[in-house]
Amino acid sequence: MPTPTAHKDAQAFNDSPRNVRTYSDLDLFFAAKSVSKDISKVTDIQAVKRSVRNLVLLNHYEKPFHPEIGSGVRGILFEPMTPITAHVLARKIEEVIENFEPRARLVGVRAQPNLDRNEYEVTVEFYVINPPTELVDLTVMLERLR
């Protein structure tokens, strides 16, 4: 009888109720807790949503010591609004999330152009890894600024 592979062993460990991780990040509004006066934090789904949003809005060379991290969507916003441009925008967002956000399992990205307001409505659908959750939707409005 063959022995289980390492992937199956790791998957069984990840599905175990003993392996529950809590993802946390700093609250970027820097709101102080009323009792301890510490900076509050965001956890789990909210932390991953904030990280995905930051990755979408981050340009290359904006993160110190990591010039490779960034989506580069600002350059696309100045291109003519066509279905091809919307597809390229969605593809760049998919790439940055798949490469730099290990806490999210991406389901899909939709970029819908709003020609009247010169903006894109980008919807990112993903699951938060460990603990598995329901489908998370993140909608970001992208518009060009001069």
Name what the model sees in each region.
Residues 1-91, 95, 107, 112-146:
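Immediate N-terminus of the mature polypeptide
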Residues 98-106:
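Short secondary-structure junctions
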